[in-house]
Amino acid sequence: IIFLDFNGMNLINEDYGAHPEFYNALTAVQEGKVYSQISFRSSASNLETALADAYYAACVMYPQQFQDIDPVEKAGEIFTKLLGSNPYHDLEEAGYAFCQITIGA
């Protein structure tokens, strides 16, 4: 399983164009197990986003153990608790969401 930060996807996709054989040799790419991670580091660390990313990763990596957790709902709870509001849908509209990624697309 590979998790990628959306802010680096342009570079990854550009590199994929130059080296597709490298990426296509990765088991996670072959098995469609490449997932997003919402950027939590810009000019400072955004703890709330890092926590939401951690729950999402846990849900992807351990689906049985986290089957009762909806990562989007959990992100909303975390954001609301730490920020006083839930910006997840704003992030989603801007292209930052929990999802599978196809490298090179």
Language model features with spans:
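Binding-cleft/active-site segments that stabilize strongly anionic ligands or cofactors
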Residues: 1-51, 65-67, 73, 77, ...
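Extracytoplasmic/secreted envelope proteins and their assembly/folding machinery
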Residues: 51-58
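Short, hydrophobic alpha-helical segments
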Residues: 58-65
